[in-house]
Amino acid sequence: MTKTPAKKKRARSSKAKGTDANAALEARIGHSFADPNLLMQGITHVSALKSGRKRGDSYQRLEFLGDHVLGLVVSDMLYHAFPNADEGELSKRLAELVRKESCADVAKSLGLLDDIKLGSVGPSADARLRKSVLGDICEAVIGAIFLDGGHAAAAEFVKRNWTERMHKPRRPLRDPKTVLQEWAQGKGLPTPVYREVERTGPHHDPQFRVAVDLPGLAPAEGIGGSKRAAEKVAASVMIEREGVGGGNDG
């Protein structure tokens, strides 16, 4: 079917808007992609995939790669920045810097929250899902930069966004589930209850959605590759929402 002039104009306008949005996103990230599809994959949640597309077309494989690239680059940064620190001290600093909450903070500072591509999950679930996968998306973007521009480009991104954090005073690492439980006890509330809401994905690569409940409070949900990981995300979401201090461990 031949497109009418009006349809052609709308198509060009839509393409131009998409190009402008990509350019703005690249500017915030600080890397111009030779292959923009890598960036799009890095910000695409599995729920946004059309029928017939593989889970590998979402951010998850890039997240795996980016996680290891981040660990390598930050390890190198720590090795040179703290020449008198022993292996144990370096490991603790590394764990704090690469935890999901740290990655999510970087993603927030870059304004990536609204760039995540999700399927139709409803406004309430949309907001929860965006927050729960923000750290994963940051790692996926690192993976995309690595594939597109190599180690040097990925290292530049990490150094630009992690150097200042590396020199901040360390905070004690605490499990968000422990923080939430202690806060609940201080409020005279019972122990938080975690329940599995949904399990999706194949047996070898499951995704768990878990909710945490406390009387008088709206449930908070988290998503992770294991029940425990999802529980920690859910606890972190409730901690952030209720303004609880002390949840620092990813």
Curated annotation (Swiss-Prot):
Residues 22-150 form the RNase III domain. Its EC number is 3.1.26.3. The active site is at residues 67, 139. Residues 1-21 are annotated as: Disordered. InterPro entries: dsRBD_dom (IPR014720), RNase_III (IPR011907), RNase_III_dom (IPR000999), RNase_III_sf (IPR036389). Mg(2+) binds at residues 63, 136, 139. SMART domains: DSRM, RIBOc. It is found in: Cytoplasm. Keywords: Cytoplasm, Endonuclease, Hydrolase, Magnesium, Metal-binding, mRNA processing, Nuclease, RNA-binding, rRNA processing, rRNA-binding, tRNA processing. It catalyses: Endonucleolytic cleavage to 5'-phosphomonoester. HAMAP family: RNase_III. Digests double-stranded RNA. Involved in the processing of primary rRNA transcript to yield the immediate precursors to the large and small rRNAs (23S and 16S). Processes some mRNAs, and tRNAs when they are encoded in the rRNA operon. Processes pre-crRNA and tracrRNA of type II CRISPR loci if present in the organism. Homodimer. NCBIfam families: RNaseIII. This is Ribonuclease 3. It comes from Bradyrhizobium diazoefficiens (strain JCM 10833 / BCRC 13528 / IAM 13628 / NBRC 14792 / USDA 110). The lineage of its organism: Bacteria, Pseudomonadati, Pseudomonadota, Alphaproteobacteria, Hyphomicrobiales. The gene is rnc.
